[in-house]
Curated annotation (Swiss-Prot):
Disulfide linkage: none
Gene name linked to the record: CHO2
Annotated PROSITE patterns: SAM_CHO2
Superkingdom to which the source organism belongs: Eukaryota
Protein name as catalogued: Phosphatidylethanolamine N-methyltransferase
Residue numbers on the Lumenal membrane side: 2-55, 108-187, 234-258, 311-362, 411-439, 485-534
Compartmental location: Endoplasmic reticulum membrane
InterPro entries, alphabetized: Phopholipid_MeTrfase, Phosphatid-EA_MeTrfase_fun
Swiss-Prot/TrEMBL GO biological process terms: methylation; phosphatidylcholine biosynthetic process
Protein's organism: Saccharomyces cerevisiae (strain YJM789) (Baker's yeast)
Entry-linked Pfam families: PEMT
Alphabetized UniProt keyword annotations: Acetylation, Endoplasmic reticulum, Lipid biosynthesis, Lipid metabolism, Membrane, Methyltransferase, Phospholipid biosynthesis, Phospholipid metabolism, S-adenosyl-L-methionine, Transferase, Transmembrane, Transmembrane helix
Summary of the function given for this chain in its UniProt record: Catalyzes the first step of the methylation pathway of phosphatidylcholine biosynthesis, the SAM-dependent methylation of phosphatidylethanolamine (PE) to phosphatidylmonomethylethanolamine (PMME).
Membrane-traversing stretches: 56-76, 87-107, 188-208, 213-233, 259-279, 292-310, 363-383, 390-410, 440-460, 464-484, 535-555
Annotated positions of the N-acetylserine modification: 2
């Protein structure tokens, strides 16, 4: 109902102890005069508690309030129900305007210019009246001036009013004018606020249906719950802020006391103006009259205008804007992105019925707005011909598929920076990838909500005769609530948080701390709670249509899954797994029954976890029963190697196929060549025998015959064989000689014959011009080198040296024609193996294979990804 409750609730809370029991000090706003405020009481006690002294104005106010009921009875008997309703409706509108506009103007001028205080000082309203009146004195009553007579009357009346109201020990002249002005101001506030409340209640009472059937239903039950909750909000708010805030005390003077957040002020921003008006809607539900609901909406909306144009400006001038370094972090990140990337511009964002940050030079903005315009115009022009069943399927499928797409991007981005890598490897920047994501996400929101609006609008239009006006208005209120939630969320976390910036630009985060400002002070995940209430509002607007219920469930589930299983794990990874209790959670846990339930749940959870841990320990104990050798990886590998050697060669003493230095080296790092020694009995040797190189995983199925092609990775055993294949075999066959019993030789597989893929390989010796296997070598490993990535210069040096040895570098540019086995994919794999990043083939072709550009680009990507880790 009043201001400083918002002032202190939003900015610093308020004292929770009674003013009379603690030593509260106050000071005037301009002169800084300190004083101890007197004990005051709340509005209801001041007016109706018979044990308290009553001033003349308080008695008049109480009589005016009570007279409303007699007037209501008389007007009802004389003019009937409808006239009486409108009579009190007009009264309510008058007092509501007097509240929001009248009190608003008074407080506005008091806040800016201390108008009431200066007026009291100028006319000495709270100064002592001398007994010997001087003709030149301000207190002279000899003058016939109406002005002086008027101010003399005001002076006497105000002093009499305060003396009759306050205890005898209250010294009127010992206090500064500010406190006395405030005490008089309270009287007029009591009149306006009580009249506003009583006339509204009478109007509502006259609007309640006479039929018991219309009263006793689910709407009335929900209405009573809202009213009871509203009463608790009012009582708890007054418990926290006391009279000082209830009557806008900080417009007159400032209290110096310990200020804390408590109770209802942990549940909602501006609780007296937000959830403090839920009783209005509870009464509207009981009445089931859309006219009452519209009046309630008017009263509530005018209160928000009062908050926006009177209280909030005063709050910011008196206490600051309430933001700290943590709450401004995301905003600073947005500024930093714009500063470091001259071609970056703020993304287009849809907020309700408007678009923010429209860029006339950005095509995607036209595309987004054009999509909305096309869908809306198409729906309006073809409303009669649209099949609602098909439209429902379209909305459902569009929402589900687009959500899966969005969720997949976020999940893969969180796990491996997939989306950023996709753009980096194609030559774009990290920020450019973020810009594309911003378009995708905003377009997803715009498209799905536009389709939902169209479908709901057509549902209402096609079945308007069955739509309940109250339900329609309540639905619009829920839509407005979701729109407000979105705006508050964006205000709290800025564009960076709205577009999941910590998924894409975590290297821009300087402080690993989640914001607890704005709406996040009350809810940990407002988008999961209030971010779908507008969709449920469409259920009300369409009179609980089954299709709208299905869509609302879909929206709710997808929102919940995204927050629970993608956003929350990522937030824990970036900011640490800290348990942050929301304001609502603190308040609920402060209630003793709920706190007891929470303790029971925690104890049960601890018991379950302990039992699972004990069971896990028992099951792990079975591993000790295994032989120790089987737990030793090195010995296990030796056993596997011996088993493979046992089938690698024939029993003949002259059958041999061995890799040189295989006892020393089983892992060949490219471009190191692999030399093979072979021996074959002379009676088995054929001049067309050949040796092929294969991946073990491809040939493991058959040890007698090779059933896969060598892909060119083969060599003859004799220089004179396979002459039609050019000089390749003359270079690979380095030695061959024959004796009476056997033939032996050496074959070297260099970069012109080797694979450029990491893996386990083997050589196979084939008989004649066939694929019959005579000998199989010991498996060995081929791996790409790990280049030096300490600096971009060293990385470029190692890369160019390797490409030169592989014969694919010419004039500093990659030319795969020099080696048919080392193509674009091999180069990509080499870079990925060395530096952990991948460049696309398209990008490398775009830069014409320039080794300098490729190496430096890969190194830059590595630095970017490292900064995101």
């Amino acid at each position: 109902m009043s201001s400083c409750k918002t002032t202190l609730s939003e900015m610093v809370g308020s004292v929770t102890k009674d003013r009379g029991t603690i030593n509260v000090k106050a000071r005037t706003r301009s002169s800084n005069v300190t004083f101890k405020p007197p004990v005051t009481h709340d509005m209801v006690r001041s007016l109706f508690d018979p044990t308290l002294k009553k001033s003349l104005l308080e008695k008049c106010i109480a009589l005016a309030i009570i007279s409303n009921f007699f007037i209501c009875y008389w007007v009802f008997q004389r003019f009937g129900l409808q006239f009486t309703k409108y009579f009190f409706l007009v009264q309510y509108l008058f007092w509501r305007i007097a509240y929001n506009l009248g009190i608003g103007l008074v407080l506005h001028y008091q806040s800016h210019y201390e108008t009431l205080t200066n007026c009291a000082k100028t006319h000495a309203i709270f100064s002592k009246i001398p007994h010997n009146k001087d003709a030149n004195s301000n207190f002279s009553t000899n003058s016939n001036s109406f002005s002086e007579k008027f101010w003399n009357f005001i002076r006497k009346f105000c002093q009499y009013e305060i003396r009759s109201k306050m205890p005898k020990e209250y010294d009127l002249f010992a206090y500064p004018e500010e406190i006395n002005v405030w005490l008089i101001f309270r009287q007029f506030v009591d009149l306006i606020l009580m009249q506003d409340f009583v006339t509204y209640i009478i109007y509502v009472y006259l609007s309640i249906p006479y039929s018991w059937v219309q009263i006793f239903n689910w709407r009335s039950l929900l209405g009573v719950i809202l009213i009871l909750f509203n009463i608790w909000v009012k009582l708890d708010a007054h418990r926290v802020v006391k009279d000082y805030a209830w009557y806008w005390g900080d417009f007159f003077f400032l209290e110096e006391s310990e200020l804390i957040f408590d109770g209802v002020f942990n549940i909602s921003p501006h609780p007296m103006y937000s959830i403090g008006y839920l009783g209005y809607y509870g009464l509207s539900l009981i009445c089931n009259d859309y006219k009452v609901l519209l009046v309630s909406v008017f009263g509530h909306y005018s209160q928000f205008l009062f908050l926006k144009y009177v209280e909030n400006p005063h709050i910011e001038r008196t206490y600051g804007d309430g933001t700290d370094s943590d709450s401004q972090m995301n905003s600073r990140i947005d500024d930093l992105i714009s500063k470091e990337n001259y071609d970056y511009s703020r993304p287009l964002i849809n907020m309700g019925l408007s678009f923010n940050n429209f860029n006339k030079l950005r095509f995607t903005d036209y595309f987004t707005i054009g999509t909305v315009a096309a869908l809306m115009l198409g729906a309006i022009m073809n409303a009669r011909f649209i099949n609602l069943n098909y439209l429902f399927i379209t909305v459902f499928v569009t929402k589900l598929v687009s959500w899966l797409f969005i969720s997949t991007i976020l999940y893969k981005q969180s796990q491996s920076k997939w989306f950023t890598r996709l753009f980096l490897e194609n030559g774009y920047t990290q920020v450019y990838s973020y810009e594309q994501w911003q378009f995708i996400y905003n377009y997803y929101l715009v498209l799905t909500y536009t389709l939902m609006i169209i479908y709901t609008g057509l549902q209402i239009w096609s079945n308007f005769s069955n739509i309940n006006n109250s339900q329609l208005i309540f639905g619009l209120i829920l839509v407005a609530l979701q729109t407000w939630c979105d705006k508050e969320t964006r205000l709290a976390i800025s564009d960076f948080g709205w577009f999941y910036g910590d998924f894409f630009l975590s290297n821009y985060i300087s402080t690993r701390k989640l914001t607890s400002q704005g709406i996040y002070r009350y809810l940990n995940h407002p988008e999961a709670v209030l971010g779908v209430v507008g969709v449920w509002g469409t259920v009300l607007m369409t009179n609980f249509a089954v299709t709208n219920i299905i869509l609302a469930v879909l929206w709710t589930l997808t929102n919940f899954i995204l927050v629970k299983f993608i956003e929350t794990p990522h937030v824990n990874k970036i900011y640490g797994k800290t348990k942050r209790v929301s304001g609502v959670g603190k308040t609920l846990l402060g209630l003793k029954p709920l706190r007891q339930v929470s303790d029971i749940v925690n104890r049960i959870e601890n018991i379950i976890i302990k039992s699972l841990v004990d069971e896990s320990k028992n099951s792990n104990g079975g591993a000790e029963l295994l032989p120790k050798n089987y737990q030793d990886n090195k010995e296990w590998n030796i056993l596997i190697q011996e088993a493979m050697d046992s089938v690698a060669t024939r029993l003949s003493p002259y059958c041999e196929l061995k890799i040189e230095n295989e006892q020393i080296e089983t892992n060949f790092v490219l471009p190191t060549p692999v030399t093979l020694n072979w021996k074959m009995p002379i009676e088995l040797y054929n001049g067309d025998d050949w040796i092929g190189l294969y991946k073990v995983i491809d040939t493991r199925a058959d040890r007698e015959k090779t059933r896969v092609g060598s892909g060119g990775h083969w060599s003859a055993t004799s220089k004179d064989s396979y002459m039609n294949h050019g000089l390749r075999h003359k270079e690979s066959v380095t030695e061959i000689k024959a004796t009476e019993k056997y033939v032996q030789g050496k074959v070297t597989f260099d970069t012109s014959l080797l694979y450029f893929e990491n893996g386990i390989y083997e050589f196979r010796y084939h008989s004649g011009n066939s694929h019959k296997v005579l000998l199989i070598s010991t498996p060995f490993e081929i791996s790409l080198p790990v280049l030096n990535t300490t600096t971009p210069e060293l990385f470029e040096k190692d890369l160019t040296e390797f490409l030169t040895k592989v014969n694919v570098l010419k004039d500093g540019k990659f030319r795969p024609l020099g080696n048919k086995f080392f193509g674009m994919d091999s180069l990509k794999q080499l870079i990925k193996n060395s530096i952990g990043v991948e460049l696309s083939s398209e990008y490398m072709r775009r830069v014409n294979g320039d080794a300098h550009i490729i190496s430096h680009r890969a190194w830059d990507i590595k630095q970017t990804l490292d900064s995101l880790a």
